[in-house]
């Protein structure tokens, strides 16, 4: 059986959403808004209603081997960076869960994907598991430091 390797298109885009947090814990940007850098990577000539979403708590991974290999095999992939793109030591994991929720909502509502499959590379694996658990049964009301966000109030949608 011959293996097909699709050529693909990489479409960078931004996800911008309202974030009611009373302070800005990253370096720049409009107060009350969060901006996530994302890449939609689609194989040419392979339509799909399913997309595989990758996110890592810190740093970018849109050029890692796994997302690229999946696209070359015919799968649609989104790599979405969190609000902590530069190995930021200010990371608050609960906020990254909110970021992943914004990416999943955008994939379903704006991009039109019916199914979202969560995938993870390193810290992205634990992030994906935490996200899905909180989307299905939210229990986290604040960070360990007693600060927002509450994932109960985040209106996360399951992947």
Which residues does each PLM region occupy?
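N-terminal cap/lid segment of alpha/beta-hydrolase-fold proteins
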Residues: 1-50
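Short, surface-exposed basic-aromatic patches at helix termini and helix-loop junctions that form
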Residues: 68-76, 98-101, 105-110, 133-137
């Amino acid at each position: 059986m011959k293996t097909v390797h699709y050529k693909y298109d990489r479409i960078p885009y931004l996800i911008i959403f309202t974030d009611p947090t009373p302070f800005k814990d990253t370096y720049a940007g409009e107060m009350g808004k969060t901006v996530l850098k994302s890449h939609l990577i689609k194989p040419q000539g392979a339509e799909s209603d399913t997309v595989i979403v990758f996110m890592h708590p810190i740093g970018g991974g849109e050029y890692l081997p796994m997302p690229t290999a999946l696209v070359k095999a015919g799968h649609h992939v989104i790599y979405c960076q969190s609000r902590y793109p530069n190995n930021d030591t200010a990371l608050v994991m609960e906020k990254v869960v909110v970021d992943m929720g914004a990416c999943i909502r955008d994939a379903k509502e704006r991009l039109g994907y019916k199914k979202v499959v969560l995938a993870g590379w390193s810290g992205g694996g634990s992030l994906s598991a935490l996200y899905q658990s909180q989307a299905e049964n939210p229990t986290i009301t604040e960070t360990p430091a007693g600060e927002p966000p509450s994932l109960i109030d985040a209106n996360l949608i399951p992947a």
